[in-house]
Amino acid sequence: MTPQGNKPSCHDVITNAWRPTATDSAAGRAPGYGVITNIINGGLDC
């Protein structure tokens, strides 16, 4: 439920409270399941 480092909160992503920054958009990060997977796995598996 709490953001950690450069990762947003899963709760914020699920509830549409998270809005991607210009850096997020440039990296292809958009609200949805893929971002949640990267948050949980730390981006190691994706």
Swiss-Prot record:
The keyword Hydrolase applies. It is an enzyme of class 3 (hydrolase). Induction: By glucan elicitor, and to a lesser extent by yeast extract, P.megasperma elicitor, UV light and dilution. Its EC number is 3.2.1.14. It catalyses: Random endo-hydrolysis of N-acetyl-beta-D-glucosaminide (1->4)-beta-linkages in chitin and chitodextrins. One of its GO terms (molecular function) is chitin binding. Disulfide bonds: none annotated. Gene3D superfamilies: 1.10.530.10. Keywords: Carbohydrate metabolism, Chitin degradation, Chitin-binding, Glycosidase, Hydrolase, Plant defense, Polysaccharide degradation. GO terms for biological process: cell wall macromolecule catabolic process; chitin catabolic process; defense response; polysaccharide catabolic process. Belongs to the glycosyl hydrolase 19 family. Chitinase class I subfamily. Defense against chitin-containing fungal and bacterial pathogens. This is Endochitinase 4. It comes from Arachis hypogaea (Peanut).
